Amino acid sequence: MKKVMLVFGTRPEAIKMCPLVKEFQKHPTEFETIVCVTGQHREMLDQVLTIFDVKPDYDLNIMKQGQDLYDVTARVLTGMRDVFKECKPDVVLVHGDTTTSTAAALAAFYQQIPVGHVEAGLRTHNIYSPWPEEMNRQITGRIATYDFAPTPLSEKNLQEEKAHGQIFVTGNTVIDALHMVVDKLKTDKALADEQINVLKNAGYDVTRLDGGKKLVLITGHRRENFGDGFISMVTAMKDLSEKYPDVDFVYPMHLNPNVRKPIHEVFGEDLTRPNFFFIEPLQYLEFVYLMEKSTVVLTDSGGIQEEAPGLGKPVLVMRDTTERPEALKSGTVHLVGTNHDLIVNEVSTLLDDAVAYEKMSKAVNPYGDGKACSRIVRALNGEAVDRYEVK
């Protein structure tokens, strides 16, 4: 039996790793499945663990007020050292591009434990965009023994870098997670009704959309956008809400003060508006429910670039670069950066032009078929694995 440890610490990681935990747990004779969380995003992480019913075996609980990247890296490195010495896993799986992933991979390397990198090979080729994520994933990629690339383009990036790890093209586990949650919401009316109540308590009455009203769903929290870029983004959102008084704009605000402060600078202390709703951060379940109800998604998130197209939603990305160019090529995503006029113009086009909207919403999602977790488990079990191909 192989002892496999999955390490993650943020909400996006948890969304993409919890389905993999559940898949490993289906094979108790082949794998002992161990879960270690770092708590890099404490409250938001715990919410996802509850949704997927995943109970960690180890919890580093590193979250502290005012911590920076130095603190996170040091705490994860030393915390994982002690966990690895006690647990002695045969392989450690980390995800993507977080500081948790890189520090955990480095800690495993120091003890010569093989590392599997889930969502390997994403690149912008600019180490400061996104920062620090681009360098994080490059470092993790150098350490990994197994590279689980979500797409053929990710595989190509790894091959060009001459990555020493064995590469498997699996699709992205976020599509597995999305399928699980959407199926739950479609088959369990009580659960769907519960999301309506949760959203209402968070500050938005989703029944406002029952008459065909359009919804622009917004998320924004990336470090590289803080400062003038974020002010420009928020100003564009304000101007759009005034230009389209019959369209609802909903922004679940990240807990980070660097996000909340510029919002108040632009909108004032009182955020109450007739068609703009600043609400508290949402758990994954209600966020997927709201995303499914949306017309357009405006975001600087990485994962949402993969998830929203799976629901047929056009995505405008408030970043200058993306490590997910497959979506640009397929037409499901457009880059708008932090440029005020470009954001306003692109959102306006999707709200006003039915042909442009249909072109984006009907484009093929290139990120997966819901079988990524199965491919990863079979790969680590030494079985033949079919290669994910973009249709």
Where are these regions (language model features)?
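Nucleotide-activated sugar donor-binding and catalytic core shared by glycosyltransferases
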Residues: 1-251, 257-391
